[in-house]
């Protein structure tokens, strides 16, 4: 089940607010300019689906985002617990960073933890199957896929080259709870 935990950016040991209610999560995130919606990831894709099959199954949803926001490209990221690069890839995005464009993810299966650093608070968003999250450009954040990642998500871009991580150098992410 999706979840949101809000912390002060000075007190990682004490949550200020928590919820697993999608409507409450959406209200909290909308207030800070972050899009969170529950979509239906109900297509049968089989085990270890190929990216083209995932795109084809959810083309209608992708087209909706493209029509709304003018995004120009999309792809699929899939991570499994047996991926030999899982530790390197996890570590890469566990440090606070920004992107020059929105970070849009639709979770088709599995889960991941997005942590946003806004307004002197940390917003930890547990995204699971059916969750659409759009983090605005230039928002300081980090992502934890867990020690045994198991997810498939559609990523939507303005420009894939613009999606380069710009690390802030802030070690704040080291102080907050991880996915596992």
From Swiss-Prot:
It holds the Pfam family ARD. Keywords: Amino-acid biosynthesis, Dioxygenase, Iron, Metal-binding, Methionine biosynthesis, Nickel, Oxidoreductase. Ni(2+) binds at residues 97, 99, 103, 141. It is an enzyme of class 1 (oxidoreductase). The record marks 102 as: May play a role in transmitting local conformational changes. The record marks 96 as: May play a role in metal incorporation in vivo. GO terms for molecular function: acireductone dioxygenase (Ni2+-requiring) activity; acireductone dioxygenase [iron(II)-requiring] activity; iron ion binding; nickel cation binding. Fe(2+) binds at residues 97, 99, 103, 141. GO terms for biological process: L-methionine salvage from methylthioadenosine; L-methionine salvage from S-adenosylmethionine. The record marks 105 as: Important to generate the dianion. Binds 1 Fe(2+) cation per monomer. Its cofactor is Fe(2+); Ni(2+). Belongs to the acireductone dioxygenase (ARD) family. Monomer. This is Acireductone dioxygenase.
């Amino acid at each position: 089940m999706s979840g949101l935990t809000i912390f002060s950016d000075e007190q990682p040991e004490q949550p200020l607010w928590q919820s697993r209610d999608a409507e409450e999560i959406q209200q909290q995130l909308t207030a800070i300019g972050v899009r969170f919606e529950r979509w239906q990831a109900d297509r049968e894709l089989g085990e270890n689906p190929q990216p083209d099959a995932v795109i084809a199954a959810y083309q209608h949803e992708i087209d909706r985002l493209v029509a709304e926001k003018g995004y120009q490209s999309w792809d699929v990221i899939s991570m499994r617990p047996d991926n030999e690069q899982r530790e390197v890839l996890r570590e890469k995005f566990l440090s606070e960073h920004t992107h020059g464009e929105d970070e849009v993810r639709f979770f088709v299966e599995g889960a991941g933890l997005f942590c946003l650093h806004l307004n002197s608070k940390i917003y930890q968003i547990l995204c699971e199957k059916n969750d659409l999250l759009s983090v605005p450009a230039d928002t300081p954040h980090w992502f934890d896929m867990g020690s045994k990642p198991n997810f498939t998500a559609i990523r939507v871009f303005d420009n894939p080259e613009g999606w380069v991580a710009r690390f802030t150098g802030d070690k704040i992410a080291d102080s907050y709870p991880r996915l596992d």
